[in-house]
From Swiss-Prot:
PROSITE patterns reported in the protein's UniProt record: BSPN_CSAB
Originating organism: Mesobuthus eupeus (Lesser Asian scorpion)
Subcellular location: Secreted
One Gene Ontology cellular component: extracellular region
Tissue expression profile of the protein: Expressed by the venom gland.
Family: Belongs to the long chain scorpion toxin family. Class 2 subfamily.
Name assigned to this protein: Potassium channel toxin MeuTXKbeta3-meucin-24
Leader sequence segment: 1-22
Length: 88
């Protein structure tokens, strides 16, 4: 009888610690999601601010624009942060 109570007591302790650890895991994941969404918003805002200034954005966009237009058999130009494909 004493052995059964002892093992039951150990099982209860293990179950309680598992529940506590699971709660910490959820808390950790929610904190991680919050931080990642904050970083995503900061990057998005920075990108929007960068692309709103054509003198800074065109060098960033131009390489993508050239590749994009080359696939269409055209020449890519960046004008006012917009990619324009000109026929060859």
């Amino acid at each position: 009888m004493m052995k059964q109570q002892f093992f039951l007591f150990l099982a209860v302790i293990v179950m309680i610690s598992s529940v506590i650890e699971a709660g910490r895991g959820r808390e950790f994941m929610s904190n991680l999601k919050e931080k990642l969404s904050g970083v995503k918003e900061k990057m998005k805002n920075s990108w929007n601010r960068l692309t709103s200034m054509s003198e800074y954005a065109c060098p960033v966009i131009e390489k993508w624009c050239e590749d994009h237009c080359q696939a269409k058999n055209a020449i890519g130009r960046c004008e006012n942060t917009e990619c324009k494909c000109l026929s060859k």
